[in-house]
Amino acid sequence: MFEGRKLLISGGTGSFGNAVLKRFLDTDIAEIRIFSRDEKKQDDMRKRYANSKLKFYIGDVRDYQSVLNATRGVDYIFHAAALKQVPSCEFHPMEAVKTNVMGTENVLEAAIQNGVKRVVCLSTDKAVYPINAMGISKAMMEKVMVAKSRNVDELKTVICGTRYGNVMASRGSVIPLFVDQIREGKPLSITDPNMTRFMMTLSDAVDLVLYAFEHGNNGDLFVQKAPAATVETLARTLTAMMGKPEHPIQVIGTRHGEKLYEALLSREEMACAEDMGEYYRIPPDLRDLNYSKFVEQGEEKISRMEDYNSHNTERLDEAGMKRLLLKLSFMQAIQRGEHATPEE
């Protein structure tokens, strides 16, 4: 489906962008464009891959003109650019709005103007019942995506999205932090032992985006069914795997804007979601404001549903957590006694 096509990845120097490159650079894709702000990361990536299919565009999703220029001649877009650190977005909420909301508006408008065939927007479980600025901005991003998809010709451009949880060992995530603390002999800093999070590998994240790309219609949102684990289970598993089962753990309390558990689908979304095996598809609500022509009687299904969250999904024990961790190249390197860097 990518033969001879051009793909642009916004925020492409991050963990997701690197995972996509590893998957696609050796295929028959014509070109992959990396669009991001950081020229140093782009230069590092250029040297690392040294591939003529890889093109680099310096720019910011906040700047419509730079997005418009970069997307000219592109067939597909994976929109991954985002501010995603919860505490920093709490202190700078308008920066989250500028990147996650207005930046998405710019990417989608540029895609429509340039006749891009398909766009997949990457969202997060924090957009469901959001209590923090990052989650609120991502929830608004999803609303922008659905609103844009209502008014676009599906024969020209398809806009859909994905929503996923914690991507294990990605840059800025907790697993590399715990590994560093174990190596340095520092107590593991746990916010709340009972806090649960969905667990996904980077490969899972790429698979989810490709599934949405292949199956999505305008306004669709896709979610992968994923296991979850408590932060304590993750910490205990890591200390055991690194030969330090008695390593101390320090409970430091939740950070700004953190939740005890995350949800991937709200109760309302579960009522209309389509079960597609390993994934859920959430279709857009395409009603207009004249509700009387759509609904004559109240919908009882919603009151019977339960949201899909990290407390009620499959719960990993330490053995299950270990099996999942060993899928990561980051942890495989550690097990071999080699230097490991976060998943890229």
Task: Give the role of each language-model region.
Residues K6-T27:
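N-terminal Rossmann NAD(P)H-binding glycine-rich loop of SDR-like oxidoreductase domains
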Residues S10, T71-A80, C121:
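Rossmann-fold scaffold of SDR-type NAD(P)-dependent oxidoreductases
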Residues D28-K41:
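Conserved glycine-rich Rossmann-like NAD(P)H-binding loop of the short-chain dehydrogenase/reductase
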Residues S36, I58, K98, D192, ...:
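Conserved residues in the N-terminal Rossmann fold of short-chain dehydrogenase/reductase
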Residues K55-Y76:
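Conserved Rossmann-fold cofactor-binding substructure of NAD(P)-dependent oxidoreductases
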Residues F56, A96, I159-T162:
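Hydrophobic/aromatic anchor residues within beta-strands of the central parallel beta-sheet
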Residues H79, L83-A139, K143, A147:
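Conserved Rossmann-fold NAD(P)-dependent oxidoreductase catalytic core, especially the SDR/UDP-sugar
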Residues V107, Q113, K143, A147-E344:
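Strand-loop microenvironment adjacent to phosphate/nucleotide-handling motifs in alpha/beta enzyme folds
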